[in-house]
Amino acid sequence: SAQLTFPHEGDEVGEMFSGVLQRLAREFVDRSIGIECETTMESMWTVHSYSGDYNPVHDHGTRTPMGVSCIMYLQVPRCIATLGNPSENFDGLNESSGAVDGFTYLTWGTNGMRDINMLRPITEEYIKPEVGTLIMFPSWLRHGVMPFFGKEDDERRTFSANINVNLKEKLTGDHYRKDHSGEQS
């Protein structure tokens, strides 16, 4: 596998794409907490993965306490593209079925087999890579990529970025209460 830096300064295409992603990040923050923000691009890169490769569960850092990260799927091998989509019709991961080979894994908690019996909500999700799909999430969100097994030259290619976020006003408990009271903003 390889990770290659994608320039976001001094490169016309990189600067343009950085601007688009920063606008999306500002919208993401505004829709999440209802506060306007300013953004700067921290880093952009591509990841080139081949049969047997995976990316262990990790999170991302930014220079600011609040950050946004994203993944865009650029190329997906046939061995992944032909798998079912767990968000549409999913029979689970019983008996190491390979049902999520090459998928992105998001986790924001811990889960166990008895969780449903204890009314504990699911705290993980698998996302099937589809060319052109962009997912954006808080930089603290732990994520990884499941290994896939295809032909030797099959490539799973993604673009990723980390975006620094500075709020234009201080976040208070009032923001939380408003967002969870059912009031419309």
Residue ranges with predicted function:
Residues 140, 165-185:
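Extracellular/luminal regions of secreted and cell-surface proteins that mediate adhesion/ECM remodeling
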Residues 69-72, 152-169:
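A short hydrophobic beta-strand segment most commonly corresponding to one strand
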Residues 47-136, 141, 146, 172-174:
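Catalytic core of non-heme Fe(II) oxygenases with the double-stranded beta-helix
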Residues 16, 41, 65, 69:
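Short, well-structured alpha-helical interface segments that form or flank functional binding sites
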Residues 41, 99-101, 154-158:
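Short edge beta-strand segments in beta-sheet-rich domains
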Residues 39-48:
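A short glycine-rich, His/Asp/Glu-containing loop-to-beta-strand
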Residues 1-36, 52-56, 98-100:
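Non-heme Fe(II)/2-oxoglutarate
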Residues 38, 150-153:
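A short beta-turn/loop motif at secondary-structure boundaries
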